[in-house]
């Protein structure tokens, strides 16, 4: 047990401090913006301090553990803890949310509610990544959905209500399977429910029952990741949402699905995962090709970036399915890498839309001339997304490749086929990303803009872009910075595996 409740403070602070937004004086939106940014910055500094001084990298066990009895009736506990798997996503959440609040500066309509919802979402996401009790994990998972639904339905494009309804139907449907899985695991094999994660990890289940649990959890996480064919909510949602919400969706929300797959499906149900991993590998390879091909046919800029996210999630799925140290480390690195790159691309797409009021690529052209800074940053992030050497995306995808090649679970021929199909996916990625940049920025097409004067990005937007670009370059040059966090935990997870 940790003496000082670091994690409780980190989880509760955003939503608690955010509730005071409604009592701030009515002096315009400036006070609300600065208050929210200060809370996010304080939270990020607290998280960084706690992890720097109280987290040991060489310890694969759960650290900073807090365990308090909450509801005596069925032994429900407030149990939080951090290990090598969750420390990266928690820091990513803090970083991206802080920049998303800065990106939300132009939001003026109902700005109190908007900023409160962003902070409530922050608490739910940190809580999901640090929960060590299955029911608490489910509660935090659901807590995060409500703010997202409201952010989607109240701020965004003309079809925002349709996309928000589609989002909530998909995710609520997935949550039913998650709740059934949590209760099934908790109630199995004892008179008293045991929702403690450590107890559940050491529990052995009959193979048939473990497969049922696995499928239930998998559906819940497949909606969030998203995995084909449960991905159709994502392009609609990204196409209509405000770009600060898109940053949180692409940067953090999708990563919760990947985290759940590793944390519950891999760690809790290793035998079932060993059985299903070849199917995950097949779905992952199909997803890379399908989403990349579909992205190429999208006219809408934000939908094209959304499909590129779906394609990149295929690499995470393949890394998880490889059941090797290398592959799983590559998947975790891809989670962090795409968190930065996806958030940045949506931010830059949104700032471009704010200026030219166009979202369809065939209506754009020549944007590089009036907006050279946005052009430079957009091109840089497009190149990092297509895995240019020296960028974080390249390292993550190469490590996933090595994970498949070194996997002992698969025969040589399937490994060759999967690697070949993944390579085709990597060839398709520059085709749709570079054609997007060409349609948007090059040429001399005169587009009809309400204001004849289009200004380039200001200091705030440059700060957000550069703040995301630095870790992308940093991880690309020195990936051990992220890999050192997870390598011991990955070995611990894979020590439970036997090959069937």
UniProtKB/Swiss-Prot annotation:
The keyword Thylakoid applies. Keywords: Chloroplast, Membrane, NAD, NADP, Plastid, Plastoquinone, Quinone, Thylakoid, Translocase, Transmembrane, Transmembrane helix. The chain crosses the membrane at residues 4-24, 35-55, 87-107, 113-130, 134-154, 167-187, 207-227, 242-262, 272-292, 305-325, 330-350, 386-406, 416-436, 462-482. It is found in: Plastid, Chloroplast thylakoid membrane. One of its GO terms (cellular component) is chloroplast thylakoid membrane. Its EC number is 7.1.1.-. It is a multi-pass membrane protein. Pfam families: Proton_antipo_M (PF00361). This is NAD(P)H-quinone oxidoreductase chain 4, chloroplastic. It comes from Guizotia abyssinica. The gene is ndhD.
């Amino acid at each position: 047990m940790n003496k000082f409740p670091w994690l409780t403070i980190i989880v509760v602070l955003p939503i608690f401090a955010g509730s005071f937004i409604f009592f701030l004086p009515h002096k315009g939106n400036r006070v609300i913006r600065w208050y929210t940014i200060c809370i996010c910055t304080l939270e990020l500094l607290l998280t960084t301090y706690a992890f720097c001084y109280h987290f040991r990298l060489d310890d694969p066990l759960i650290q900073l553990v807090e365990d308090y009895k909450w509801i005596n009736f069925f032994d429900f506990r407030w149990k939080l803890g951090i290990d090598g798997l969750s420390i990266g996503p928690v820091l990513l959440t803090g970083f991206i949310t802080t920049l998303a609040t800065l990106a939300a500066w132009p939001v003026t309509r109902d700005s109190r509610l908007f900023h409160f919802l962003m902070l409530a979402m922050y608490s739910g996401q940190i809580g999901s990544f640090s929960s060590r009790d299955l029911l608490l994990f489910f509660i935090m998972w659901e807590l995060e959905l409500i703010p997202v639904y409201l952010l989607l339905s109240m701020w965004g494009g003309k079809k925002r209500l349709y996309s928000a309804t589609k989002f909530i139907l998909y995710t609520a449907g997935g949550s039913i399977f998650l709740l059934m899985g949590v209760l099934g695991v908790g109630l199995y094999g004892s008179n008293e429910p045991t929702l403690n994660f450590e107890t559940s990890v050491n529990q052995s289940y009959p193979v048939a029952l473990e497969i049922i649990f696995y499928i239930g959890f998998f559906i819940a996480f497949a909606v969030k990741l998203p995995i084909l064919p449960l991905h159709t909510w994502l392009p609609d949602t990204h196409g209509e949402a405000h770009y600060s919400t898109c940053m949180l969706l692409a940067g953090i929300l999708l990563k919760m699905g990947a985290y759940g797959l590793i944390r519950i499906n891999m760690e809790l149900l290793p035998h079932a995962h060993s059985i299903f991993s070849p199917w995950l590998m097949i779905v992952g390879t199909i997803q890379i090709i399908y989403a990349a091909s579909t992205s190429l046919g999208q006219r809408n800029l934000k939908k094209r970036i959304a499909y590129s996210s779906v394609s990149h999630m295929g690499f995470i799925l393949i890394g998880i399915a490889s059941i090797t140290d290398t592959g799983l480390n590559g998947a975790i690195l891809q989670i962090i890498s795409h968190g930065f790159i996806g958030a940045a691309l949506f931010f830059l797409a949104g700032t471009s839309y704010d200026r030219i009021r166009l979202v369809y690529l065939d209506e754009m052209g020549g944007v590089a001339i009036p907006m050279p800074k946005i052009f430079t940053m957009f091109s840089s992030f497009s190149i990092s997304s297509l895995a240019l050497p020296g960028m974080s995306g390249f390292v993550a995808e190469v490590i996933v490749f090595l994970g498949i090649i070194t996997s002992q679970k698969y025969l040589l021929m399937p490994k060759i086929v999967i690697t070949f199909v993944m390579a085709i996916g990597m060839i398709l990625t520059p085709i749709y990303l570079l054609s997007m940049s060409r349609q948007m920025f090059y040429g001399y097409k005169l587009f009809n803009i309400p204001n004849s004067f289009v200004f380039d990005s200001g200091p705030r937007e440059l700060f957000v872009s550069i703040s995301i670009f630095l870790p992308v370059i940093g991880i690309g040059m020195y990936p051990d910075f992220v890999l050192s966090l997870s390598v011991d935990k990955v070995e611990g997870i894979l020590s439970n595996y036997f090959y069937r």
